């Protein structure tokens, strides 16, 4: 039950002027204790904040649906971000595309096989794996899942970014909202 690939509306314009204007998403895979764990996050291009995420042992339609629902629930009235992904089957399923359309969100997709079109998401996955996954031996998927959740909380609330003037993503958004 697949829809068509959306056009690349984002066009590598990775700067956003306000929160919830441009979101990007993707899925990454980890291994622990002989099992796999998949992470499906949404990143806000305004401040690099992970606004929603889900993990599961299989990269299913359900994983992406739960992640999307969390993202949609976080939106305030009138917020309709562009949501950019690759052309993975998860993002071409009719139910996913309908959920976006029902909320008035515009879907954008990378060109086929072009990971640079979603560079900010790839960059986040790189930091995540470098800082909490590589060189560590997780005995179980549960232990790894806890570490992923802790890292994302740290990323959002504590990890400073020079591009945000030395603030964390949440601090940067809070400052912006106070000034607004």
Regions found by a protein language model. Give the residues of each.
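Charged DNA-binding/catalytic regions of mobile-element recombinases
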Residues: 1-180
